[in-house]
Amino acid sequence: MFNPKSPLLMSENNASAHTEMNTEIRYLVIYGYTSRELAKVIKHFKLHLPEYVKMTVRTQSLVSRITLTGVDNKVELLRFNMNRFQQMLADIFSEEVISMQDKTLPQVLGELLTERELSVSCAESCTGGNIAHRIVQIPGSSAYF
């Protein structure tokens, strides 16, 4: 039976159908915006992203994780543009940036405390217990808590 998509019948013009697509992901974690406030701030930025870049936002307790996912067959250009888009977002939120990696606030806090050889403690209370719970979830937190 004739199959027009048979690899044996594909011409060089159709070779692009086999082009490997590359995926690049960039993150920006920021603090201080509700979902609604953040949507207003990034609306213009999001509208001007190319088709091959998708942006998702997840906000919880004023900590937002913005994820940029780019898919294209030109890997070097994709990396360059993804880094550029991430930096553009970082410039918009310069004072509110927690991390440009996929890290939680407790992870970033732990890294800073370890790097500066500092420690943190909290009194036992409802709030203190919740803070302690979030900190001790991070491997190695006994070095600073």
Walk through the language-model features, giving the residues of each.
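Non-catalytic beta/alpha edge segments that cap or flank active sites
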Residues: 1-145
